[in-house]
Amino acid sequence: MVKIAFTGGGTVGHVSVNLSLIPTALEKGHEAFYIGSKQGIEREMITSQLPETTYYPISSGKLRRYLSVENLKDVFKVVKGIGDARKVLKRERPDIVFSKGGFVSVPVILAAKSLNIPTIVHESDLTPGLANKIAIKFAKRLYTTFEDTLKYVPHEKSDFVGATIREDLKHGHQQNGYALTGFTPNKKILLVMGGSMGSLKINEAIRRHLDELLQTYQIIHLTGKGLVASNINQDGYVQYEFVKEELTDLLAITDTVVSRAGANAIYEFLTLRIPMLLIPLGLDQSRGDQIDNAKYFEKQGYATMLDESELSSDTLLLALTELEKNRHQYIQNMESFTESYTRHDLLEKIIQDALQLEVGA
């Protein structure tokens, strides 16, 4: 049996793969624990959805690509985080560290390297983020979701593994989705997702044309924490800050989705053959990874993309109208998407590589 230290955080995308792997690891008799930040979204997700998994909070600092006085403060946080992670790893003595990226993962990877514990880094996006660019230098293996990512990373330690799809994704129950929302199967359902923190701009665009949109859809709106508009109470429109295990049931009744462009979410929509309008985070809020993702899937004919800089209630409505007009073509294009681009046995590969790395240590 193998003991795995999981890490990764900052966004849902940096946690969701770990959320699917940990229960499988435990069911197969392996041991698992989590190292994350003290206040990040990963702490809430892991402790609430996997209460049997020990969560170790460590100090962490944000990695910025621009000059800021905060960078100096965060250097000390990262150094403390390395010390925190070393204490945890020395106590738990895992066979392998599996990292999904995000700034909290860097101290863990560095601590593991100092203790000669092998690490595997998983990159979901088309191009590696800053945290993973640092982590790759100290990791034994890198797994990529996109085959094209291999152009940007060291070939000798990299494997294209495809997207990791949750086992329960296709097992959502429509009756539960309808019961939760109060909706009916007689009218299309639009799911709006603004990412881990929600999106004020997407929320505003949806609400400005709500009456018009409700003529075509029933709408499930995942607004983000603290962004539910309590003054809006209309039939066919439900709001949630965030959903957890209910998401599979909501996806089971979804006809069309408006979403940010995190790779994990896109692959899930693609697996379920849900036509999607992708509104990636702009360059003012990110390094452009979601823009790359959205352009990639749009080029494949799987989605349509709306640049956030062009987002308004009018452009959103127009983009959705065009998407609906061509929805059957998008679904047909998605049928060409094969299971070879997804992976259901990632845990087995992690275990296999962990044993090989242990032998080769």
Spans of features found by a protein language model:
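Conserved nucleotide-sugar phosphate-binding/catalytic loop shared by glycosyltransferases and other
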Residues: 3-8, 26-76, 307-309
